[in-house]
UniProtKB/Swiss-Prot annotation:
One of its GO terms (molecular function) is mannosyltransferase activity. Residues 33-72, 137-163, 228-360, 410-430 are lumenal. The keyword Ribonucleoprotein does not apply. Its main location: endoplasmic reticulum. Residues 1-11, 94-115, 185-206, 382-388 are cytoplasmic. One of its GO terms (cellular component) is cytoplasm. In T.brucei, PIGM has a different substrate specificity compared to mammalian. Given that the protozoan parasite evades the immune response of mammalian hosts and digestion in the gut of the insect vector by means of its coat proteins tethered to the cell surface via GPI-anchors, it may be a good candidate for chemotherapy against African trypanosomiasis. This is GPI mannosyltransferase 1. Keywords: Endoplasmic reticulum, Glycosyltransferase, GPI-anchor biosynthesis, Membrane, Transferase, Transmembrane, Transmembrane helix. It is a multi-pass membrane protein. It is found in: Endoplasmic reticulum membrane. The keyword Signal does not apply. Mannosyltransferase involved in glycosylphosphatidylinositol-anchor biosynthesis. Transfers the first alpha-1,4-mannose to GlcN-PI during GPI precursor assembly.
Amino acid sequence: MELQSLIDTVSLQKLLLLGALLRLILIAYAFFHDQWFRVKYTDIDYMIVVDGARHMWNGGSPFDRTTFRYTPLLAALVMPSIWIANPMGKLIFASSDLGAAWYCYGVLKSFAKERSAKWMVSLFILFNPIVLSVSTRGNSDMLVTFMSLMVLSKFARRKCYQAAAVLGFAVHFKIYPIIYALPLTLGVWEQSVAASTNTWRRVVKTAVVVSICALMAAISFAVPTVLCYMKYGQQYLNEAFIYHVYREDHRHNFSPYWLLMYLNMARRHLGQGVDFSPRLVAFAPQAVVLSFVSYKLRRNTAHACCVQTVLFVAFNKVCTVQYFVWFIPFLAFLFCEPKEVEDDESGGSGAFKFFSWVKALGVVLMWAATIPLWVTTAVPLEFHGYSDFAQLWIVSCLFFLAMVVLASMLARIAYRVQCTKCSAKSIKVA
């Protein structure tokens, strides 16, 4: 009760300030950690981006830095790291955490109790250890999550064209937000269903809105992409887009597909060609489950995007820790307490009555436990050269199953919520 009273008295601005202070402390700690420890706190990807920015500032191309495989706009964004001090880029990425929390809170306020909204933002973004670690180590993935949450915030306020424009720009930074196009399109249809009982009118209105949204998204994607292509040519397309389609990572990859990639690499080295393409093997189940989830959870776009992202990460041919920040902030939409739901006789309320906290905690802990299990299994193979391929692949399969079980639980919660009368009234706008 004391904690509940405390969260009631703390404003969102104070929570954001505390989150910012914590991130400043971690960024400062990283400077000393990197000086004294062999394993650096700073992510290697951050060093690559800063090096790319340095090449750009010196009149060259960010792609002059080997393994720079991002949009040049990212290098331009961290240019203060060259002008002022190296950690400036980390401050920019950490600021995206705060922006993500702001937009997440804005969406939550439309259907969740204020206390619950604060708790969710604190738990899944501001003080979440994975989110904290990823952004303060200098990884840019939360920047795209920030834009994805901005899309949902615009959509929740019926600003569909603005949402589409932001989505197109987000896809320019990373390809994966394109998966939100289908649930957003179905969300537009559901909005038209709520606004009119005439089927023909709904179809026409949806077609017009979706067409304009598609045009807005295409323009906001094409403009920066064409400008970057005009400046850096085919190398930009190869590194920023095409590479990620053909990417095969057999190291630091939680996905079970890493073994197939490793065997393919060995066959190519021996000149024997490739038996199976991970792209095709991974894409087919991804497309099926994402389409199915989008349709079943179409009445709640926020829920659909959350479950979609978990499944996308689970079925992706490459999965690393920073990918977790793609979906962790979205969990706030599923575990919040809707404002228009009264406590029931058993003491549960809102979304809390749709699942057992014990069961939910067990599933989350099961998924979380597979992470250190995978790391401890991978270290002997990846750093010491021990031949533990079979053992690591089995652990990767366990991680995949844990992700699927987590997604299944989230989908069950979301479906039960949207099937209730209260969710139709209070959550549909999201």
